[in-house]
Amino acid sequence: MSIFSTRYLVTPFSSFSPPKAFVSKACSLSTGQPLNYSPNISTNIISSSNGIINPIRRSGNYEPTMWNYEYIQSTHNHHVGEKYMKRFNELKAEMKKHLMMMLHEESQELEKLELIDNLQRLGVSYHFKDEIIQILRSIHDQSSSEATSANSLYYTALKFRILRQHGFYISQDILNDFKDEQGHFKQSLCKDTKGLLQLYEASFLSTKSETSTLLESANTFAMSHLKNYLNGGDEENNWMVKLVRHALEVPLHCMMLRVETRWYIDIYENIPNANPLLIELAKLDFNFVQAMHQQELRNLSRWWKKSMLAEKLPFARDRIVEAFQWITGMIFESQENEFCRIMLTKVTAMATVIDDIYDVYGTLDELEIFTHAIQRMEIKAMDELPHYMKLCYLALFNTSSEIAYQVLKEQGINIMPYLTKSWADLSKSYLQEARWYYSGYTPSLDEYMENAWISVGSLVMVVNAFFLVTNPITKEVLEYLFSNKYPDIIRWPATIIRLTDDLATSSNEMKRGDVPKSIQCYMKENGASEEEARKHINLMIKETWKMINTAQHDNSLFCEKFMGCAVNIARTGQTIYQHGDGHGIQNYKIQNRISKLFFEPITISMP
């Protein structure tokens, strides 16, 4: 149902006769006693022996969290400390000096671009933002004096990608030099693996406003020959094989930044002529950021335990670490963003629990009441709610109030109505899907997506992020953000998450009982096979990235920091769903990725 979704498990069997033990346990819900949860039972309204009508619930069969309270509290990174910080500051100063020297060198554009690319992929470019922008501006404003490099596919595609990533206009027409008289890419490029890889990565920076299909043909051409390269085998250049395979799985433009950093640190060490000081800088920075994240996770796990949501609502997923992963995907850097990450993780954890209330536990009547209460967002609305919903509702109210208090204190603006609207829109989308389920209705793909981009859950995360990272918050930008339709920079990233979620989880969810997803909607509407539907959804993802690229340039009212959060959540979603349901169900690849991000420091040898 959402980025936190698994399936609907509420099934209204009319002839089901439950065991007596299940009846007695369900009765506690109507009497207001603590919830005594019974797994693996279907929802049906029945009468107990005392005449009270009680809904029999069904479990999501969720596995316990992999990362419990005791484990999180025990985490510690031993590769941080005074001597590590001293070395890091030395390397950082040296890199700043090197970048400023490069700025004043008119030549060596390729070297400049390669260094900037490596700084980004190694996760340390945020330390050198000003220097990088100055260098790129100089490259953009003057033509290169390196004629041989300028004529290479590798250089041209790298330049195109790096400049576009940083908001500099550069026409795709510069790639026309690599086409023959028939308008096809030259066959002489087929063996230029480095150039093809850069061309492939550059092709994902296309926008919807570009009418030419040049970048699309570049993508097709590069992908085909990169696949041929992998099939041919290249035992001498194992690092290049890994780079190509990695890019074909998830392009760099669509990859969660922090995951890319951890992966690329290991790869970069094996690339010929790798800069050993840059490797050391990246490892030190990764460990410092990881230690900061560990401290935040310890604080969050204490909050989560004190909330008692996992204990009192055992049907819901206990996923505080996974929630934190979403947020570090949005904004990982700098201790000044700690409050933002803490609060957005709370928002994500709340959205997970609320999603499970709609997906797994609540009856349709209860969900109607719950939706109305969320639209009101006031304490007295709790009186209308079933007992098991009260704790969740109050936790939601407190979380929103904490964020609203901070913004009111700092900027004098009451944002509670805006936060309420985002939660109300989310709950209404959940309710719509519940109604579809109970009526057996399969919407068209367009109708499904109009609701599903909201029900995926990222809306509340991005709206809360806006208020936490934007200063000052102007009346103009508020009106734009909360107009009749949310801006594209919120809608399109949510669409990416919804579609990648559906691709990763749809088959299992439909087997276990759920509302139709985008795949099933397309299949029914077009009489298509599942394979054809999946191909269409992948095409939709590709086109949606063009919409995101366009929105990045069109939404000038928003600050750079917020724009980064909005785009990064799309990258995070695509990465989290790369190997399955990265939020709800963890296989080895997903567990290993989270462990490397938060719990396994990189070993560094210090004198």
Curated annotation (Swiss-Prot):
Reported induction: Up-regulated by jasmonic acid treatment.
Cofactor: binding details: Binds 3 Mg(2+) or Mn(2+) ions per subunit.
Alphabetical UniProt keywords: Chloroplast, Lyase, Magnesium, Metal-binding, Plastid, Transit peptide
GO molecular function: (4S)-limonene synthase activity; camphene synthase activity; magnesium ion binding; myrcene synthase activity; tricyclene synthase activity
UniProt cross-references to CDD domains, sorted A to Z: Terpene_cyclase_plant_C1
Short sequence motif named DDXXD motif, residue ranges: 355-359
GO biological process: diterpenoid biosynthetic process
Gene3D superfamilies named in the record: Farnesyl Diphosphate Synthase, Terpene synthase, N-terminal domain
Amino-acid positions noted as binding Mg(2+) 3 in the UniProt annotation, renumbered to this chain: D501, T505, E509
EC number: 4.2.3.105, 4.2.3.117, 4.2.3.16, 4.2.3.15
Pathway: Secondary metabolite biosynthesis; terpenoid biosynthesis
Residues bound to Mg(2+) 2: D355, D359
Catalytic activity: (2E)-geranyl diphosphate = tricyclene + diphosphate; (2E)-geranyl diphosphate = (1S,4R)-camphene + diphosphate; (2E)-geranyl diphosphate = beta-myrcene + diphosphate; (2E)-geranyl diphosphate = (4S)-limonene + diphosphate
Comment on protein domains: The Asp-Asp-Xaa-Xaa-Asp/Glu (DDXXD/E) motif is important for the catalytic activity, presumably through binding to Mg(2+).
Primary role: Monoterpene synthase that catalyzes the formation of camphene and tricyclene from geranyl diphosphate. Also produces lower amounts of limonene and beta-myrcene, and traces of several other monoterpenoids.
Protein name: (-)-camphene/tricyclene synthase, chloroplastic
Native source species: Solanum lycopersicum (Tomato)
High-level lineage: Eukaryota, Viridiplantae, Streptophyta, Embryophyta, Tracheophyta
